[in-house]
């Protein structure tokens, strides 16, 4: 039995209607089989750069920048023997014949996607088992395949694992995970938010609506883990996922179409008009000047509408510039204008606006330490919004025409190549909708 009466219409990445009157809870991470599968597979999937390992060993460059050790170079045809290495890795990691261990060679054997069996995750406290098991299995496979002696074994280890265990972030290594190391988490429950914007953009191959969906799915699923989407607040996060992340009722696409030649301010006008027309907000009082103050008839839905408008405003503004740099100021001033226009709180009740202030400073302005694409929901600057600030940044980076120093191609090439090989990661919108249709009559 469903807890909420909300029904939504679902649309594909091109804005074509796929389903109508779907229960809101069909997209919940607690019910949707695709989202459940995505979370599980993100935890057990590791990207391996076989070409990088071969190059590191050939040049003696192990452990990252500035770590070239003359005389330690080893010539191995890792790419040429990729199939044998992959088979050996699978045989080491497999718990039982026919289990869900998966090893997939990509790009002619230059990269490898490895999924550890679920049983290894089941007996682990957290997801580090995937990276560590894969790294150790790959090390043994290389040592066995190429008859590496005891004196060069540590060099092979470093070519794979980088500076681990001295650095728990695998600095200079040739394996990667979407989630990163647990030691980097800003707080409890932040693991699914520890995915850089550029990783999401690269994984979805810069598909705008899919990148937004991918980011929103993980950000809002993290809210369930963090205890935010519990009790009275669950519906708020489900509606946010639906309207901002999954383009429910085609709201985002319609806003963008209506403001194709518009501005951030015109998007604000459109979302306010839409909220009034749908009865989401109503006039509270009219001032002597004729200015209307509004109140929400449904505060959670108002937040969801505002969040959808935020993504649309970023698409209009950053899309016009073909550049992502103004995404922070767009998030900030969309909310600022929206609050002045209605007298109501902006997206996430002020948290997204507050996030944008710090985000503006640290993504350019006086400091300018990194572009928008390197931030994530676990970052000390952008962690404060409860799942609503990172999806718009993903939208901006999808539309960037190469203006960024920290581009997805530069920061996320390995992750993008490997994770995009899995359909549900590359096209999450399509498969989450399929999952919703699968369970909608079972709720």
Swiss-Prot record:
Localization in the cell:
Cytoplasm
Quick one: which residues bind coenzyme B?
369
> Keywords on this record?
Cytoplasm, Methanogenesis, Transferase
The main enzyme category here is: transferase
Extract one GO BP annotation from the record: methanogenesis
Q: How is the cofactor bound?
A: Binds 2 coenzyme F430 non-covalently per MCR complex. Coenzyme F430 is a yellow nickel porphinoid. Methyl-coenzyme-M reductase is activated when the enzyme-bound coenzyme F430 is reduced to the Ni(I) oxidation state.
Which positions are annotated as binding coenzyme M? 367
Keyword ATP-binding attached: no
- What is catalyzed by this enzyme? coenzyme B + methyl-coenzyme M = methane + coenzyme M-coenzyme B heterodisulfide
Q: Name one Pfam family in it.
A: MCR_beta_N
The pathway it acts in is: One-carbon metabolism; methyl-coenzyme M reduction; methane from methyl-coenzyme M: step 1/1
Q: Which cofactor does it need?
A: coenzyme F430
Molecular function in Gene Ontology: coenzyme-B sulfoethylthiotransferase activity
InterPro entries per UniProt? Me_CoM_Rdtase_asu/bsu_C, Me_CoM_Rdtase_asu_N_sub2, Me_CoM_Rdtase_bsu, Me_CoM_Rdtase_bsu_C, Me_CoM_Rdtase_bsu_N, Me_CoM_Rdtase_Fd-like_fold
Its predominant location is cytoplasm
Which Enzyme Commission numbers does its entry carry? Answer: 2.8.4.1
Q: Name one GO cellular component term.
A: cytoplasm
What is the role of this chain?
Answer: Component of the methyl-coenzyme M reductase (MCR) I that catalyzes the reductive cleavage of methyl-coenzyme M (CoM-S-CH3 or 2-(methylthio)ethanesulfonate) using coenzyme B (CoB or 7-mercaptoheptanoylthreonine phosphate) as reductant which results in the production of methane and the mixed heterodisulfide of CoB and CoM (CoM-S-S-CoB). This is the final step in methanogenesis.
The subunit structure is: MCR is a hexamer of two alpha, two beta, and two gamma chains, forming a dimer of heterotrimers.
Which family does this protein fall into? Belongs to the methyl-coenzyme M reductase beta subunit family.
Entry's NCBIfam families? met_CoM_red_bet (TIGR03257)
Query: This protein is called what?
Result: Methyl-coenzyme M reductase subunit beta
Source organism of this protein record: Methanococcus voltae
């Amino acid at each position: 039995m469903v807890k909420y009466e909300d029904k939504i219409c679902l649309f594909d990445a091109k804005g074509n209607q796929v389903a109508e009157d779907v229960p809101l809870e069909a997209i919940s991470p607690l019910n949707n089989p695709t989202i459940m599968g995505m979370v599980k597979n993100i935890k057990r999937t590791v990207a391996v750069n076989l070409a990088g390992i071969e190059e590191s060993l050939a040049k003696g460059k192990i452990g990252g920048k500035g770590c070239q050790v003359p005389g330690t170079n080893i010539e191995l045809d890792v790419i040429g023997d990729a199939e044998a290495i992959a088979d050996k890795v699978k045989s080491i990691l497999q718990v039982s014949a026919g289990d869900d261990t998966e090893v997939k060679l990509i790009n002619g054997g230059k990269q490898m996607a490895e999924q550890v069996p679920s049983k290894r995750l089941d007996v682990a406290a957290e997801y580090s088992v995937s990276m560590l098991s894969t790294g150790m299995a790959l090390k043994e496979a290389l040592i066995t395949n190429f008859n590496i002696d005891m004196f060069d074994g540590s060099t092979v280890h470093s070519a794979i694992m980088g500076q681990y265990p001295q650095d728990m972030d695998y600095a200079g290594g040739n394996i990667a995970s979407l989630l990163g190391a647990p030691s980097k988490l800003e707080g409890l429950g932040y693991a699914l938010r520890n995915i850089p914007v550029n990783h999401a953009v690269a994984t979805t191959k810069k598909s705008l609506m899919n990148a937004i969906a991918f980011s929103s799915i993980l950000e809002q699923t993290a809210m369930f883990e963090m205890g935010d989407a519990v009790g009275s607040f669950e519906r708020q996060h489900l509606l946010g996922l639906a309207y901002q992340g999954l383009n429910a009722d085609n709201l985002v696409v319609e806003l963008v179409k209506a403001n194709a030649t518009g501005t951030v301010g015109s998007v604000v006008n459109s979302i306010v008009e839409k909220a009034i027309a749908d009865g989401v907000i109503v006039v509270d009082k009219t001032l002597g000047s004729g200015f209307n103050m509004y109140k929400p008839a449904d505060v959670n839905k108002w937040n969801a509408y505002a969040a959808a408008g935020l993504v649309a405003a970023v698409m209009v503004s950053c899309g016009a510039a073909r550049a992502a740099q103004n995404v922070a100021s767009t998030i900030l001033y969309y909310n600022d204008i929206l609050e002045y226009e209605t007298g109501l709180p902006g997206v996430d009740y002020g948290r997204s606006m507050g996030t944008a202030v710090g985000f503006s400073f640290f993504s350019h302005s006086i400091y300018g330490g990194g572009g928008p694409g390197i931030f994530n929901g676990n970052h000390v600057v952008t962690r404060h919004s409860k799942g609503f600030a990172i999806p718009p940044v993903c939208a901006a980076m999808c539309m960037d025409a190469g203006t960024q120093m920290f581009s997805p191609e530069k920061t996320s090439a390995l992750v993008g190549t490997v994770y995009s090989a899995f359909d549900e990661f590359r096209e999450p919108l399509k498969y989450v909708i399929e999952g919703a249709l699968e369970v909608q009559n079972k709720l």
